[in-house]
UniProtKB/Swiss-Prot annotation:
HAMAP family: PyrH_B. PANTHER family: URIDYLATE KINASE (PTHR42833), URIDYLATE KINASE PUMPKIN, CHLOROPLASTIC (PTHR42833:SF4). Inhibited by UTP. This is Uridylate kinase. It is an enzyme of class 2 (transferase).
Length: 233
């Protein structure tokens, strides 16, 4: 495996119900990312913004496009927070934003991002696709394809895809492998339909796992632990 993209939800950066950012959690994520980076694998990241603002369910009476732009700005804050933690470990990283903010971070340039990774730097993609009405999951799959990644991994609070919500149904069963068509036809909410369609059309495998420990990213890269894979028709 040469190059991978890890999607991290904004909620994962926060202590549950306590704060917008949890320094211990962010440090744990950074150490886990460094561990994979030290394997010689090129790593890029997409960060969500749901711990700060979620466009689809934010302030009432704000139109969807404006809310989505607010969510994109939230992802930039999260990207800078994670960049600081990664750099503090002695690993060089760069933030690239789909919405240019030149005094804060680099604008997104595909070839420059690839060049950074080839120079052993971690690249953090912020501001989603730069367009409203597209989720950060869609941005993650899009960047995975653009970067020529071998796989897109989505780190969540649940260790894979289940037949039902495992938090409310103790009999829910984890599904280890699904096709893109399965996810679309069953309307599974693990990824939005745009993200699944892009992955399917470009043959990008997607792995869903729980990013609950420093070792989680490392383990799933080495095909250890619990996870679900989406690939194949």
């Amino acid at each position: 495996m040469r190059r991978v993209l890890l999607k991290i939800s904004g909620e994962r950066l926060a202590a549950r119900g306590v704060s917008v950012h949890d320094a211990e959690v962010i440090g744990m994520l950074a150490r886990g990312i460094k561990r994979v980076h030290e394997m010689g694998i090129q790593v890029c990241l997409v960060i969500g913004g749901g711990n700060i603002y979620r466009g689809s369910s934010g302030i009432p009476n704000i139109d969807r496009a404006t809310g989505d732009y607010m969510g994109m700005l939230a992802t930039v804050i999260n990207a800078l927070a994670l960049q600081g933690a990664i750099n503090n470990l002695g690993v060089v990283s760069r933030v690239q934003s789909a919405i240019p903010m030149r005094s804060i971070c680099e604008p997104y340039v595909r070839q420059k991002a690839i060049s950074h990774m080839e120079k052993n730097r971690i690249v953090i993609f912020a501001a989603g696709t730069g367009n409203p009405f597209f989720t950060t999951d869609t941005a993650a799959v899009l960047r995975s394809v653009e970067m020529g990644c071998d796989v897109m991994l989505k780190g969540t609070l649940v260790d894979g895809i289940y037949s039902d919500d495992p938090r409310t149904n103790i009999n829910a069963e984890r599904i280890t492998k699904l096709s893109y068509t399965d996810v679309l036809s069953k309307k599974l909410r693990v990824l939005d339909s745009s993200a699944v369609s892009i992955a399917r059309d470009n043959g990008m495998p997607v792995v869903i796992f729980s990013l609950d420990s420093e070792m989680a990213f490392y383990e799933v890269i080495n095909k250890q632990g619990n996870y679900s894979t989406i690939e194949g028709e």
